[in-house]
Amino acid sequence: ADWQRAASDAFADYLARDVAPIVGAHERERRLPPRELVRAMSGYGLLGGLLPEALGGQGLDHVTYGTLLAQLAGTWASLRSMISTSNLVLSIIAERGSAEQRERFLPALMRGDTLAFFGLTEPNVGSDASGVETRAERDPASGGWRLRGRKLYISNGVHADLGVVFARTGSGADHAVSAFIVERGMAGFSAREVYAMGMHCCPLGELLFDDVLLPAANLIGAEGQAFAIAKHYLNLGRCFVAYVCAGVSEAAYKEACRYAGQRQQFGRPIGQFQLVQQMVADMMTRVESSRLLAARAADALDRKSADAQRWC
């Protein structure tokens, strides 16, 4: 649609003007993206844009959101990781949280004033939501919960202001997993950076929960019902990861084309050799295939198709 093209073009102009020039220096120095860039993402719909207007969102469809996310990923993958992780968490709070939780946490998250992490992955079970070993037990004295365990490879984990943590609240044989909002500064909660090869400006974190006392009000939804939450939002996340991969691949393809046009060999640009042309054509084919597959998954989500999970 025309409005989608206009939104994409405006975002592309912004990325080229205000984001692309600073990426190299920030990645080399491992500096977090400036907070004003994070806040700017809100205006383009990347923080809460999928939510209905009644919840403060823009009611974007998944195809449009994915297209914008791919553009951001192709420009600065670290900023994309920071934004999409925070958006995932604010979506959970908006759609599954209580009115009190929405009122307390959503406005700042949607403005980009605060950032969030998604605390699922663990050392021994990966992202298997049914097998999490982190536990939360009721605290009779406070009426809240005591959280104990460890999460690993968590995007935004080192610098986020809050996050959603999945913890077992039932026996090991069932899927009684619950979701809790954990805030930075809570006693017993600590985080450290985990080295990663790429995306240096959005470091991964190891999160430790040493008898963290959580208020009862920080439980999202009903006790023991978070397995379905994790499953739903992981499907959503996979769709957008496909867009991200397409965006990064397209950026690499464009760089390859630029290089092939500049690099001289035997008196002419290497892009004039048939072998290089074939390689570039194969790249373009794969980039377009990945983009179309991502769009197919997003369209299935928009149509609420029964086979959406298969495409995601």
Task: Name the predicted role of every residue range.
Residues 112-121:
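A short, Trp-centered hydrophobic/proline-enriched beta-strand micro-motif
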